[in-house]
Amino acid sequence: MVQRLTYRRRLSYNTASNKTRLSRTPGQQDRLPLHQEGRESTYIRMWRVPRQTARGPCCETQVLMRLSKTKKHVSRAYGGSMCAKCVRDRIKRAFLIEEQKIVVKVLKAQAQSQKAK
């Protein structure tokens, strides 16, 4: 005969969100109590590069909700959503773009002064 399973929560169907594991206890002959399994935690990926961020703990979203803000992110620009290397690269790229804009402006001014003479 098939073993009867007893769910502890309201959801009584074998779905992906209702994963359980059997718990054998003495005296439980006709039914087996089940323990609910927690969800697998995934590390937080960066939005540019699929790599793990230098962020706080790697845990379930329910646990993250209970943590304070200081434990969920790193105290720097883009802390918690980008790693330090990507932030450095972003700052360098922005600086070089601004430098290029200035160079173009200076070259235009020189060309106009040459035309005027």
From Swiss-Prot:
Cross-referenced InterPro entries = Ribosomal_eL34 (IPR008195), Ribosomal_eL34_C_sf (IPR038562)
Q: Which Gene3D superfamilies match?
A: 6.20.340.10, 6.20.370.70
GO biological process terms on file: translation
A GO molecular function term, named singly, is: structural constituent of ribosome
Q: Does the keyword tRNA-binding apply?
A: no
For the region Disordered, give the residue spans.
Answer: 16-35
Subunit organization? Component of the large ribosomal subunit.
Q: What is this protein called?
A: Large ribosomal subunit protein eL34
Which species is the source of this protein? Vicugna pacos
Gene that this polypeptide is encoded by: RPL34
